[in-house]
Amino acid sequence: MIRYVFILFLLTSGVAAFAQSGKKHQIPQMPNPIARNATLEQQWKSLQQSPSQLAVRDVFLFLVDVLDAKFLKAGQVEWALKLVQTRVITDPTAPSYGNMYWGWSETGGDVGDGNNVEFCVQYGILIKLLFDDRLSVEARKTLDQIFEYALKGIRNQPIRISYTNIYVMRIWNMIALGQVYKQPSVVDEGRKLFDIWLNHIARYGNREYDSPTYCGVDLESLLLIHRFTSDSDIKTKAADALRFFMNDISSHYNQRGGFLGGAHSRDYNRVFGRDLLEEKYMNPLLGGENRNTHLFHQVCLSELQKLGLTPQQKELMDRKNRFIVQRWDSLANTYACDFVGNKVSIASSNQTYSPDDKPFAIYLSSTRIPEMINIAFVMEGRGDHYGTWSYEGMGEKMKHLIPVNYPSNGGWGKTRHLMPFMQSSQNKGEFVMLVSGEKDHNCIYNYLNSTIILPNTFDEIWIGNSKIQVPALGEKAIFDDTNAFTARFEDVAIAFRILWDNARKDSKAALYNDGFKYNPSREAFHLEHNEALRLTLRHPDNGIARIAMWWKVQEGIKSDADFQKFRQTVFKAQVVVNEENGIVDLVVSTPSGKLGVKSDFVNKKRLEYYNPAPLPDNFLFNVDGLEIGKPILDKYKR
């Protein structure tokens, strides 16, 4: 009887979802209804297969568009919701009680990765907000039952505060569920989570910093809160969080190339990191093509367009030679730097974040070639230099190599590199970095590789004092004793010099031409200049890799003489390296002063930084010496 009354409450209150605000939410127009309809046709076909070929969470994304476009009949919508309902874990004794399976064949009551309920509600609650009046009585009843369990599933799933995209998604879900079903206590649960999270980022920054995927997910949840909440306190908090995030994104963004620069915490594309953030939000916001085919994304984009960029954010995006320093965690030494010039930017992180981060990167972009393969360093043990392991299905092909006692969440089928110890010291357009790693459970070889991915767009390339051509397909050019590589792109010069490594004496780094061409798969865009090269050093067969490098970029290289001067600066710079008892002390004498690090790679301790321009004190998000993060978020410290 109690359960009947609760369901009746859901049914009656759900019909009037958000009616207390006294307005009906405007539904934005889709940019290409024909493309949207084609997507609906494909997804409907996938959903009807047995088993369904549409992921459970994507059914909610699908139904939002179905109801907007009136694509299905009422009975078909009921069928789809009841199909999803079979994936809800309703056993109160199950580990994942209230959650939803990701697919259609799992059983046992344990979903493993508990994030699915968060995504399902993030998408699906728009049905209640926008189209509740288009549901049949039976469809509404089914959806309300799903969300009744979902609230339990959300509460049952532990989430660490540093798991930014899911934590912020939970905030949105709690606020939306509480408001839709007129449960103020649930809204207050969301408010409390919001307060805790704002305090955390006010002190330590955004841990999932500058991710082309997950900054987009963060924006979605914050934009939805800002658009739909009827609580002025929560709306103000969302506005402040959005301002902080958009300051960050604008500082790193390359509008000409349509991509997010800087070091990346999580980047599923090792060679060119454009993803959800750029394709669905930033590029359409900035006047690029809007290829959104789902109303969910269009709702979020329309709110972002309504907010727009502030004058400060526009100026940040256009400012040349800006230097950004940002904190990204409560742990010591967790910060990243980015120097953004006109045609080049160079970025470093002082600590690894994840097995799919991009801690050392250079981005080139000009009017002639706005977008191309990025330059990125990776240390890995799969021979997966370009990060294609997942796309090529190598996890399945190499499953016979899975080690004994492999962790259940190890990500064998995913693209993975090491999470090594690292330390870096960056002074605008140059940095010195040290990386030390050991073979882990995702490696398939006894040795590790240090690789730098390069675009095949250079006007000239040099190894040491020898100008060379790009190696023929399948060939390589071996480094000489200078251990240096320089290249020129228009008026930009770049250099890499290996300062110290543990490779065998007969093992030299080399420039390889594998004939690699990148074809986007996660997002639908075309990259014309998609060819890549790589510099790779193979480390010893003991599974240990150690390397220190000096990366340098410079613009304004107008002549051969300018480039010769740049190269000689790199070759002739005094380098001092001392190694003793696992401690490496290395310094490069640059024209600006000493640049380097001192590291205890055995005990994984950062002992000292040498930098002619020390980092600002007590920074959160600092651009050119001005702190722009704390003025927004300091009021949320508790």
Give residue ranges: language-model regions.
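Extended repeat-based interaction scaffolds and adjacent low-complexity, acidic/S/T/P-biased segments
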Residues: 387-638
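Aromatic-lined, polymer-binding surfaces characteristic
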Residues: 51-229
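Carbohydrate-active enzyme catalytic cores, enriched for enzymes
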Residues: 232-348
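Non-catalytic interaction/regulatory modules that flank or connect domains
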Residues: 313-403
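Mature N-terminal, pre-catalytic/accessory segment of carbohydrate-active enzymes
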Residues: 19-51, 628, 634-638
